[in-house]
């Protein structure tokens, strides 16, 4: 956190304009128990690197910057996340079971929990928009749409609810038609 803010100060002193502060995947905890998979997916602030995330976000906003977080949502919400108990309950999983909440855009309960219990609280802390990253392949069957395409649509529409014509997401290319939503 200190070094990130120091970097922003260096840019400002050098006269280099920065409008968006981007936090790649190390913003969240990546060192998770191996039984839950890799650390690519995560939603719990890494307090070793960012001990006071709200203060960081407030400082960046005070400098006139917008803030985006990089997310790789494919692994869903695992028991290692602070949001896990609430999300598990919301989708009908007993949190004591430690069963991961699978990423499933065909499940309305998951979609509601994903936005309302995971993303919106981070937005309330000061996240302005999301950098959606998906490297886990296309749909699970030929009849389904690429998950990244669906994810982009859902995130963009969610942003429109709050930000109207200021809605924005960043994403990889998700195939034909995907240019409608991300940059």
Q: Language-model segments: which ranges?
A:
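Catalytic-domain carbohydrate-binding cleft regions of carbohydrate-active enzymes
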Residues: 1-183
């Amino acid at each position: 956190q200190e070094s990130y803010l120091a970097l922003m100060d260096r840019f400002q002193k050098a006269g280099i304009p920065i409008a968006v502060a981007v936090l790649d995947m190390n913003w969240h905890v990546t060192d998770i128990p191996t039984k839950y998979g890799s650390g690519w997916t995560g939603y719990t602030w890494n307090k070793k690197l960012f001990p006071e995330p709200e203060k960081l976000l407030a400082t960046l906003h005070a400098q006139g910057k917008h803030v985006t977080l990089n997310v790789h949502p494919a692994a869903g919400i695992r028991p290692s996340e602070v949001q896990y108990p609430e999300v598990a309950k919301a989708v009908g999983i007993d949190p004591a079971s430690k069963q991961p909440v699978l990423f499933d855009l065909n499940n309305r309960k998951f979609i509601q929990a994903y936005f309302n219990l995971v993303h919106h609280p981070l937005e309330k802390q000061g996240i302005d928009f999301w950098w959606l990253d998906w490297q886990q392949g296309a749909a699970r069957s030929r009849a389904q749409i690429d998950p990244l395409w669906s994810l982009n649509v859902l995130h963009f529409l969610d942003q429109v609810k709050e930000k109207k014509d200021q809605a924005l997401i960043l994403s990889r290319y998700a195939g034909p038609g995907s240019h409608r939503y991300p940059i």
